[in-house]
Amino acid sequence: MRSAATLPYESNPSQGVQGCVRLSFVQRHGQSRLESLYHSDPMRVIIPQTPPGEPVHGVVVTTSGGLVGGDQLDIELIARPHTQLLVMTQAAEKVYRSTGADSTVQIALHVEAGAFLEWLPQETILFDQGRLRRTTQVYLGENARLLAGEMVLFGRSAHGEQLRQGLLRDSWLVHREGALVWADLLKLEGDLQHPLQHPAALAGAKGCATLLLAGEEAAQLLEPLRGWLAEAGMEGPSVKVAAGVVHGLLVVRWLGWDARLLRQGYGQMWSWLRGQLGRPARMPRLWDI
């Protein structure tokens, strides 16, 4: 494995830590190769050996084990023209209880002309009284393809924890060739039991997920995806899923009343979409570790 040296930092509990990742790949001699890599504690990047038949992989690691109030993380991924890559996170991101300050995560995904990027973060677990503000900005070039998503779990259901107070502000902004084509915002703040339990809102769900596919195949895959979801029995009392197309983007929403089944179904759908896009119809090994 290859990784860049990390930069030292001094932790200040009142201010949190500031970590960042800057990662770009370029096409050289018909292969996607690392162009530049910068990271600072508590973040680092590992470039593992590429599995057969797969695009080059990058793994983002948060060595602190989770986010506390005041932490700020900044991730920027750049896929230069015609590159093929997959970037994922090593493990679930935990957002711990805060005494008042917000944890902030800024993500920028640049997918230049003819490139294909998969951004596969593992689930975010929001602890009771955790506070998270996350923004994902996407910049698509001509004929760019992106498969990306996020999954959020509301509390540690395996420990019987209920999410009662806190903040979740999770937004997406997608630009295609300079024009904003999709904006999305989920905001829960203060007393979280009302929106989490209300039948017209999250109806007691333990987690939710969003998947986004951009590319010329996106709209054409809507009906095949719906058919696959039905045949695979993805919907049931523990999981609800819906898919649609917005300005040429395929958007899939999930609600789960069982966190394990939500993650399992989400991964199966991701694998199916990979197969439709010419990649192996499987999840990276790290997903199941």
Curated annotation (Swiss-Prot):
Role played: Required for maturation of urease via the functional incorporation of the urease nickel metallocenter.
Chaperone keyword on record: yes
Subunit structure: UreD, UreF and UreG form a complex that acts as a GTP-hydrolysis-dependent molecular chaperone, activating the urease apoprotein by helping to assemble the nickel containing metallocenter of UreC. The UreE protein probably delivers the nickel.
Keywords: Chaperone, Cytoplasm, Nickel insertion
Pfam families per UniProt: UreD
Main location, first listed in the record: cytoplasm
A GO term for molecular function: nickel cation binding
Protein name: Urease accessory protein UreD
Localization: Cytoplasm
